[in-house]
Amino acid sequence: MYTQYYKEAQKLAQKERRRCISRGQYPYLSVLDDFIPAEKSAAATEVGTIQIPIEWIVGTKTGGRTTAFARNYMPLLDESTEFAAKWMKLCGAHLEEGLRDPIEVYEYMNRYYVAEGNKRVSVLKYFGAVTIAAHAVRILPERGSQETEIYYESLDFNKYSKINFIEFSHPGRYLELQRLVGKKPGEAWTEEERRNFSSAYYRFKKVYEAKGGKRLLVTVGDAMIAYMKVYGYQELHSKSEQEIKKSIGKIWEEFTLQQEDSLIDLKLAPNQEKKPGILLKILPNGESKERRVAFINDKSPSDSGWTYGHELGRLHVQQVFHGHITTTAYHDAMAGDPSQVIEQAIKDKNTILFTTAPRMLSVSLRAAVEHPEITILNCSLNKSHRYIRTYYARMYEVKFIIGAIAGSLAGGHPVGYICNYPIFGQIAEINAFALGAKMVNPNAKVYLEWSCVNGLSAATQRLTDRGIALISSQDLANPNAESYTFGLSHITKDGPVNLAMPVWHWGVYYETILRHILNRSFQSEYEESTKALNYYWGMEAGVVELFCSKRLPDGTQKLAEFLRQGICSGICKPFYGPLCRQDGQVIHKEGHSLSPEQIVNMDWLVDNVIGDLPDYEQLTDVGKSTVDMVGVEPSTKDRSIKERQSST
């Protein structure tokens, strides 16, 4: 009665075997015992009876039945064999009453190897079942590689989510998924949340693979994360399959990007171009049409030194390109719905948009996908998206010099440092400052506080309560603030005395980017790269600078200038030489320097910093929304905090 099913399954097996042989691949099931030593199997741990994804069942525990199945688990033996008769009997049982008894499997690196129940797996795979009940035993791999670290992250994720059917190819994504579905790190999932996520995952998987996702070297989980970053988790539930298909088509480059070993192409300096003629210097390619450029700020210049700096940059652009570019500022975008502010800017016929705060990254990305004719850039760092570009400055170069100034003035006293947010770029600034202080003062200690925890005044008070008078505070002063404490200051009974300050030349940054857009080199960069483009320019490009007070001793001013020239020429590298973390781990020894990618991805603090990365729950609302967008990777952040706590 069920012979026809067996014949069809056998044909699938024969086809798979031929395909594997033609490609030089092993055509049968993998055998766990062939690559896992017996002593490791003996030390395996019981997981219990769980539902496992059938697609992740890839082989057998022992070699007894290996050649009875092709690599796709379809049967190869003749239909007259006892094996075939048992297969067809199970086929009937499945169709009439269902196969309920759990199989027995060994799990290794999220793949399952059957100890008992191979034919049940074969039958259920033939009929397209998604999961199967299994009594599982887990064999843990040795740690040390990126692959195993991702695996251990999946185990941590499974503890509180009970989700075991999604996998990723990059570290940190399980905790990123936890955030994207609206859960706090470590927060347990309810049964309803698991059902809803399972439904969303398999709906997305069906559409994504039908669209061609199987051709990409990308896990379904990677693709789903990329989708959710643009459209959100809730929208995945509400959209029909046809709507999901349309959305996937719009962001296909976000999926192909996931195939890259390194997702981001850091542009460390502006493109070197031939000097244009007088007319083209202002407006390349002889364009006569006036361009409209929008600057969308999360706050207002009167309330935020950061926004005030970007507003000065906009005014610089307006002056330099007068008559050729018109700029418009949109303030307080985060006071309401920032997506509506972006839409209004587009309705106002702006074709180039700068969103000047990291927490507007998500809405900027969504707008860029929906409006491919509009050029959108977001002021943030280390974000992997093809449809927008990010820009930030290597402020750590200036902070290294300021740290050296502080170290030279501190003597035997500690120095204070107040940081805004634990985000990409700012961790490097903390460490560069501390290393600069240590370079001139080997015993220098830097006490770290956060303005995103109870505000700037509270952070300053915590330092002064320790008797610390030399403090590096916010980079930019709020023009309406009563106190103009910024940069490196000496706190006296009569008030702060400013000694040195970092300067962001946003006008130079915006002018250079706009020239690249107008002369088409901006588009050429996109076409020549398959990665996400992040601009990360430094002192040499003129986008950041150091101003020193005349109150500084002459020798200290000369030291600062010497270091500035060294950094601009590439001779002086802030992260060169032996580096050691707070927990004692040596990052590298003498004669080496961190790569730009390592600098950007810092989630650890050097050994002369006293303090920690703040806990998420301690942050202000603005701090949380900023960290949600561009915070250091949660997995490594949480791990580094735990390591530091355990070492104290």
Where are the predicted features?
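Short, charged/polar connector segments at secondary-structure boundaries
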Residues: 1-116, 126, 170-183, 211-278
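A short, basic-hydrophobic beta/loop patch
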Residues: 97-113, 119-150
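Short beta-strand segments enriched in small/hydrophobic residues
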Residues: 282-306, 414-420
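An alpha-beta-alpha
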Residues: 314, 401-441, 532-551
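Hydrophobic alpha-helical segments within soluble ligand-binding/sensing domains
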Residues: 392-413, 503-524
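Segments of small-molecule ligand-sensing domains
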Residues: 520-525, 529-645
